[in-house]
């Protein structure tokens, strides 16, 4: 360092320059760290959006499956409601044989992400669960080869129609890809006819 002294370089300037270099390096390092964190968070948000979009499509498909089953079961109940003894227990079991909603149950911790649809989503699958238990109670009180009676048939038909209507609400809001459009329109028309027939048949009882 003798040559610095020989040219008259003040050590104070050198120290100041060194400190400024360290400060600039620190600022650049801090900025780089912020950029890395920002990029990581951005990538994470993109991943979450992709995963949620996939979940919406999966849940939407499951809702469609159950909605078709409920409107079909409702139609079977209506066809049997004129019988004096109502629907047979065998037909009731066959019509209301719903599978376990695997996608919904395995993603219960993500239900809150569906925002304004959360209540309807929980109500849809909750009503199906309640209906299963109702069918089990009816089975416990009816002979295996017997019928469930007109009142029980009407009650089950009303619950099935309500579930179908909730399903219609959900598929139009949770996920509505174009490749489902034709099937969704057919379902809406089928539900509209079922709702109109129900209201004409039971004008004072509404949809439940």
Task: Give each language-model segment a name.
Residues 36-40, 45-46, 52, 73, ...:
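An N-terminal structural lobe/cap that precedes and organizes the functional/catalytic core
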Residues 43-64, 68:
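Juxtamembrane membrane-water interface segments immediately C-terminal to a transmembrane helix
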Residues 1-47:
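Membrane-embedded hydrophobic alpha-helical segments
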Residues 12-14, 35-38, 49, 125, ...:
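Helix-centric, low-specificity signal for extended rod-like, repetitive segments
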Residues 61-208:
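Interfacial alpha-helical end/capping and short helix-turn segments at domain and membrane boundaries
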């Amino acid at each position: 360092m003798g040559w610095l002294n020989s040219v008259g370089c003040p050590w104070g300037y050198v120290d100041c320059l060194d400190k400024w270099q360290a400060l600039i390096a620190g600022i650049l390092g801090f900025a780089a760290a912020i950029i890395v964190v920002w990029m990581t968070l951005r990538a994470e948000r993109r991943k979450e959006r992709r995963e949620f979009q996939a979940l919406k499509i999966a849940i939407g498909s499951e809702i469609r499956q159950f909605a078709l089953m409920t409107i079909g079961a409702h139609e079977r109940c209506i066809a049997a409601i004129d019988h004096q003894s109502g629907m047979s227990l065998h037909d009731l079991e066959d019509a209301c044989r719903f599978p376990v909603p695997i996608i919904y149950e395995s993603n219960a911790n993500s239900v809150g992400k569906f925002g304004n649809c959360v209540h309807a989503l929980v109500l849809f699958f909750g009503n199906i669960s309640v209906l299963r238990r109702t069918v089990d109670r009816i089975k416990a009180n009816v002979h295996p080869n017997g019928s469930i009676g007109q009142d029980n048939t009407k009650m089950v038909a009303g619950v099935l129609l309500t579930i179908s209507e909730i399903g219609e609400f959900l598929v139009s809001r949770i996920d509505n890809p174009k490749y489902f459009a034709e099937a969704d329109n057919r379902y809406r028309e089928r539900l509209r006819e079922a709702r109109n027939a129900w209201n004409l048949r039971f004008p004072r009882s509404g949809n439940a």
